[in-house]
Amino acid sequence: MNYLLVFVGGGLGATVRHAVNMICARAFGTHFPFGTFLINVSGSVVMGLIAGYLAFRGSAAQPWRLFVMTGVLGGYTTFSAFSLDTALLYERGEIGLAALYAIGSVVLAVVGLFAGLALVRHLT
């Protein structure tokens, strides 16, 4: 049942992500990735609201967390999970590790993308 909750939530999140990208492309053009920018920021805000509420006001049932946080927000943007992981490291006082995680994730993700592009160019 848990996998089904994540699956359905992920489908909803991905659908909203696509809609936001299309709306932003029509409204602002495609010269800057406004859609992705908005998705990453808004997903992180929503993740912070939910995580903060659960931490300070009480816990929610595991199925609800799986559906909303892993499913919907995971399908909408993985940046929200990245932001939460960074904040949790920082909140635990592991500031250096939080910085290493944040910088390393961004740098290595971009380097990985370029490596994938270069490999495909080389093979084709």
Curated annotation (Swiss-Prot):
Catalyzed reaction equations: fluoride(in) = fluoride(out)
Superkingdom of origin: Bacteria
Alphabetized PANTHER family for the sequence: FLUORIDE EXPORT PROTEIN 1-RELATED
Control of this protein's activity: Na(+) is not transported, but it plays an essential structural role and its presence is essential for fluoride channel function.
One GO MF term: fluoride channel activity
InterPro entries associated with the record: FluC (IPR003691)
Cystine pairings recorded for this chain: none
One BP term from GO: cellular detoxification of fluoride
Membrane topology: Multi-pass membrane protein
Family the entry assigns: Belongs to the fluoride channel Fluc/FEX (TC 1.A.43) family.
This protein's name: Fluoride-specific ion channel FluC 2
Cross-referenced Pfam families: CRCB
Compartments, as annotated in UniProt: Cell inner membrane
Entry's transmembrane regions: 36-56, 66-86, 100-120
Originating species: Nitrobacter hamburgensis (strain DSM 10229 / NCIMB 13809 / X14)
Any one GO cellular component localisation term in the record: plasma membrane
Binding sites annotated in the UniProt record for Na(+): 74, 77
Keyword list, A-Z: Cell inner membrane, Cell membrane, Ion channel, Ion transport, Membrane, Metal-binding, Sodium, Transmembrane, Transmembrane helix, Transport
Signal peptide: none
Protein task: Fluoride-specific ion channel. Important for reducing fluoride concentration in the cell, thus reducing its toxicity.
